[in-house]
Curated annotation (Swiss-Prot):
Zn(2+) 1 binds at C156, C159, C213, C216. The J domain is necessary and sufficient to stimulate DnaK ATPase activity. Zinc center 1 plays an important role in the autonomous, DnaK-independent chaperone activity of DnaJ. Zinc center 2 is essential for interaction with DnaK and for DnaJ activity. HAMAP family: DnaJ. The gene is dnaJ. It comes from Thermotoga sp. (strain RQ2). Its main location: cytoplasm. This is Chaperone protein DnaJ. Keywords: Chaperone, Cytoplasm, DNA replication, Metal-binding, Repeat, Stress response, Zinc, Zinc-finger. It is found in: Cytoplasm. It comes from the Bacteria.
């Protein structure tokens, strides 16, 4: 009977050009959906579906296995071959191959699935962690140092990241006898075959731990809360990403730490509008202040205020520029604080105010209705 080929992309419900992230998301969703414990009334079907999902993910999540699968695996409709009563020619080849090596030919292409107790252990870099931080305009004047607290995986203190229980040591891998390689020799009507591959159980090292670490379960890392201080440069732009080397998760089995990526969010200040290294501030004065002159208080981004003299006869929408009161540029030189002066004209006047203004208009020769 012919061995049914499986379309792993169809099993996970992803296109053939799916990214690793898309494959991972589909896998997580499906293993939750088809976990046998969630289908007690139809457990056998759920177990079979769950097994297929695991099998598909093991191949498609590994770039090398996926490339080999894309080249040799099942794609589209299953091809058919002319068969005799004794079975198809290619069925005989596949069956003979399995008789020789006790392995499915597709397992040779894609790699056998290790048993549950078999674990390949090699150092891998830890994942990066993304963390958003909010800063104010005052933080942008001279820069700031802001404390942050977050969770990350750190190197297991019990095993030092090896995943091995202290003093347990290693033993020769029983699968390969300590050589790190599996060699198989068989004879058939095809001739004499020699097959050699990396031992899946020890990953080619020839050794396996006698006992895995009791604290981390063999992963070499544990979850911890950490505190760090993030240095914010002056006048950083909203959305800027700062990378702190080694601030991410610990690597697997002694691998290097990932990075902490800090995304800076500048908290809007309702008093100012930011324009590069300049700040814009709008102020409204009474028409009499514009006519007679006055002094107004203007806030500064770093805190506190400064006094701005409004000369007599100031026109509406006059712009004043306070040099060096803005934000620092890339060279450390501060921009300006730009003050836009708006003049408020009253919509109604009291009888006394109107009388005074009419007398003033008469003296200045201004015609009014």
């Amino acid at each position: 009977m012919k061995k049914e080929k499986k379309d792993y992309y169809e099993i996970l419900g992803v296109p053939r050009d799916a990214t690793q992230e898309e494959i991972k998301r589909a896998y997580k969703r499906l293993v939750k959906e088809w976990h046998p414990d969630r289908h007690p009334e139809n457990r056998k079907e759920a177990e079979q579906r769950f097994k297929e999902i695991q099998e598909a993910y093991e191949v498609l999540s590994d770039p090398q296995k996926r490339a080999m699968y894309d080249r040799f695996g099942y794609v589209g409709e299953q091809p058919t071959y002319q068969e005799t009563e004794s079975g198809g020619f290619f069925d005989d080849i596949f069956r003979e191959f399995e008789n020789i090596f006790n392995r499915d030919i597709f397992d040779v292409f894609f790699g056998e699935r290790p048993h549950q107790e078999e674990r390949r252990e090699y150092a891998r870099r830890g994942e990066d962690i993304r963390y958003e931080i909010e800063v104010t305009l005052s933080d942008l004047i001279n820069g700031a140092e802001i404390p942050v607290e977050y969770e990350r995986y750190e190197t297991c203190p019990r095993c030092g990241g090896t995943g091995v229980e202290p003093n347990a040591g290693y033993i020769n891998c029983p699968s390969c006898g300590g050589t790190g390689r599996i060699r198989e020799e068989r004879r058939s009507f095809f001739g004499y075959f020699v097959s050699e591959r990396t031992c899946e159980r020890c990953g080619g090292t020839g050794k396996i731990p006698r006992e895995y670490c009791h604290e981390c379960g063999g992963s070499g890392r544990v979850l911890r809360k950490v505190r760090k201080t993030v240095k914010i440069p002056p006048n950083v732009e909203d959305g800027t990403q700062l990378r702190i080397t080694g601030g991410g998760n610990a690597g697997y089995y002694g691998g290097p730490y990932g990075d902490l990526i800090v995304i800076v969010r500048v908290k809007p200040d309702p008093r100012f509008k930011k324009s590069g290294s300049d700040l814009v501030y709008d102020i409204t004065i009474d028409y009499l202040q514009a006519i007679l002159g006055t002094t107004v208080e203007v806030p500064l981004p770093e805190g506190g205020t400064t006094m701005l003299k409004i000369p007599p006869g100031t026109q509406p929408e006059t712009v004043f520029r306070l040099k060096g009161k803005g934000l620092p540029n890339r060279y450390g030189r501060r921009g300006d604080l730009i003050v836009n002066v708006h003049v408020e004209i009253p919509k109604s006047l009291s009888r006394e105010e109107r009388k005074v203004l009419e007398e003033l208009a008469k003296k200045r020769g201004v015609t009014i209705d």
